[in-house]
Amino acid sequence: MLIAALESAFGTDNGLSQAPGFMESARFMQYMTAPGGDCFCFSDSPVEAECNMMMFWFAGKAKDLSLLWIERQYLDRPDMPFAEDRLLPSLMVFCSQLDLKNIGKPKKNFWFSRGDTPVFIYRGGWDSKEDTYLGVKGGSPSTSHAHMDAGSFIFERDGVRWAMDLGMQSYITLESKGVDLWNMSQNGQRWEVFRLSNIAHNTLTINGERHLVKSNAPITRTFESKKQKGAEVDLSSVFANSVKKVVRTVILDQKDHLEVTDRLETGDKEAAVSWIMVTPAEAKITGKNRMELTKDGQRMLLTVDADTEVEMKTWSNVPPHEYDFRNPGTIRVGFETVIPANRASQLKVRLIPLK
């Protein structure tokens, strides 16, 4: 709004819009919205998407109407909320300068942003709520508003969000109950909040310990072909107190089957590994290293391939504290295993649709 006001009053923003990454943030927001309509809600992001009238300014500034592909659909929904609805009159100003009859879909299906919080996105299409969607996150708990969610992922297929993030908990509900929310030290109370902890995210937990706050998990490789779509995240610093190395690869194969591969190397101590995925589906353990997920008439087979003994598990999402938000209609699924000392090991999980 400031830039729009400066341009209107003075004919220039004196270079503010050229700040590194600023114009790209519009495309970032677009990719963060999944086909099903919810956000890739890592860190302190809410789950629900909103119509953002600033996207119309970005579209005009960038001369790229494809930025409005999702927003145009929102305008057809009377139930859709607006972000900062007090600024809604600005929508008419921005739209008056655009030809809204010629909004085309985005041309790309991949997004990869580096920086302190690297994120990879694959969007199988832009036309259907049943399009496949994969989001992968690296980063650090030490960044602004972060959770212990390095290595986490979101996965949608056939209209179901099979792997989800519970999203943020509003600050007032925690601070009003005396939670020291902004103490981000390793032993800070922030990490006792269920939704902020690593045990409530689609990532690994080793020896029951928290992720290291002063760690950083870079996305070291991306895959952007028809045969493989996804990213590799180096989680070694996240677990530096427990193991020598952890590298996670999250990909979709040619059939859009999800594969999550974790390669670990232990030191002179064994490592008890918990593999966790949060889901809205119902789950049933159907055999050794196998589990079936069911949601909205769809079924998904979860299999584990490991060189150690695996115990398949489901966990309730009933949180441990009175101040935690409830999480109805969700559970955690996965497995536990122990990797011996001085061992290189691989854990591979596949999600395969069942007809």
Where are these regions (language model features)?
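Catalytic-core segments of enzymes that bind and process phosphorylated/nucleotide-bearing substrates
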Residues: 156-158, 167-169, 290
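Active-site donor-binding loop signature of nucleotide-sugar glycosyltransferases
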Residues: 138, 166, 206
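Short, acidic Gly/Pro/Ser/Thr-rich loop/turn segments
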Residues: 129, 143, 171, 211-213
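Carbohydrate-active enzyme catalytic cores, enriched for enzymes
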Residues: 1-163, 224-228, 232-234, 330, ...
